[in-house]
């Protein structure tokens, strides 16, 4: 299979070959929906890819916004990812416990803040484990570094942008939720859609 942006996805085989690269940071970007009654920050220390650090979307967000997981300021993102040992030269690979669900959001956040050298692990932790690769419960203490944001504002649309897209028909809006969440037959924080 070919991809429009093949650098955006790496295979488990690639990660297995490159796991010890000092220029690589592996991130667990797992986020569970509130209805799952699970806590990814509590689960991470029990089982993660060896050498991975945890990207906490609850912490790396705009704390002043009433909506969850809104993008943080450049300063907050820089501080938090720098504390994870990520600078602008590092290659970042993101995975999650579902395969590719929440890892894609973490990937997009890095792209939004100007980090292009980021990829999602195809198949995530389930595929990694199924293939017999190393997992760990050992804590990792990353060496803090400096990450400089280069915000890519075109990757976010506001209400006026969305309204114009709907009116003009010059774009397509996709709702990434499951059909049940979209239709309101499964629990959802917001029972609306465009």
Q: What does each model-found stretch correspond to?
A:
Residues 1-192:
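Cytosolic catalytic domains that perform sulfur/thiol-centered chemistry
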């Amino acid at each position: 299979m070919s991809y429009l942006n093949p650098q955006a996805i790496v295979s488990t085989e690639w990660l297995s070959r490159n796991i010890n690269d000092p220029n690589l940071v592996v991130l667990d970007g797992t986020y569970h929906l509130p209805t799952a009654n699970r806590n990814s920050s509590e689960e991470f220390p029990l089982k993660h890819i060896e050498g991975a650090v945890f990207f906490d979307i609850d912490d790396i967000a705009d704390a002043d916004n009433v909506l969850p997981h809104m993008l943080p300021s450049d300063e907050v993102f820089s501080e938090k990812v720098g504390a994870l040992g990520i600078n602008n030269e590092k290659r970042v690979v993101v995975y999650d416990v579902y395969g590719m669900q929440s890892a894609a959001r973490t990937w997009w956040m890095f792209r939004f803040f100007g980090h292009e050298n980021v990829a999602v692990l195809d198949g995530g932790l389930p595929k990694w484990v199924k293939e017999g690769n190393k997992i760990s419960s050992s804590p990792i203490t990353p060496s803090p570094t400096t990450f400089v944001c280069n915000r890519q504002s075109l990757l976010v649309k506001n209400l006026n942008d969305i309204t114009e897209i709907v009116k003009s028909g010059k774009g397509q809006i996709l709702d990434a939720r499951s059909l049940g969440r979209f239709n309101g037959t499964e629990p959802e924080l917001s029972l609306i859609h465009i």
